[in-house]
Amino acid sequence: MGDTSTTLGWWLLGDDDRLVGGPFTSQVDAALAELATGAPGRAVYGLRMDDDAVLPRFSPEDQAWLAHLSDQLNRLAEEWDTLISDADPLTGLVCEVAAAVVETGLPLHDCTGRTPSRPLGGVCLTPSPAQGGVIVSWAQHDRMAVHRVRGGAAADAAQETMTAAVADVLTAYGFDVARFDGSIAYLVQAGEVEQSSIWD
């Protein structure tokens, strides 16, 4: 008979994937245990088996994140509908860019009014198949974008500042970012995007 699962939780694994400790109630607790041991390791959420192997599973935090990201991706403009495909490289790129934006704490903008969030503003992601990238810009709340409650000069300055800030963040995350055709928008292409640990 094969192994049967015993406990689901956070575990600390060594470099050789050997079980070092756990279960822990959170990833932070597992990472703190790693610091306490002084030995290299990694925190993994999963099922501990009878032979002490750990089968990775999505953590509650992962599941909540994926649900939130999915909600944000639903805000993409209708022009993405014909492009979203496992075979299209832009699909992977827009998902990576969207994840980076949302991880930063910024919402995606609902450019075409698919959800009630359209007036709130956020980051616009527009496909650019000819350039093999995603055009990124900032959309302000309707109070600024439509009604210009602080005046046109302030609205224009905020638009350019926020768009540049988003571009700077994506550059820091390893994407290739360049000003798009002399506009205030930026073209984002795939670069050397790195994933960091929670301690970096």
Q: Where are the model-predicted features located?
A:
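Short, mixed-charge low-complexity intrinsically disordered segments
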Residues: 39-68
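Amphipathic alpha-helical segments
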Residues: 90-108, 161-173
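A short, charged, amphipathic alpha-helix used as a generic interaction element across diverse proteins
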Residues: 24-45, 167
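A short, exposed loop/beta-hairpin motif centered on an aromatic-Gly-Thr core
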Residues: 16-27, 155
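Long, compositionally biased intrinsically disordered terminal regions
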Residues: 49-52, 62, 138, 143-149, ...
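Short aromatic-glycine-(Arg/Gly/Cys) micro-motifs in beta-strand/loop hairpins
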Residues: 1-18
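Short, compact, well-ordered microdomains
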Residues: 157-191
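An N-terminal amphipathic alpha-helical segment
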Residues: 67-75, 98-148
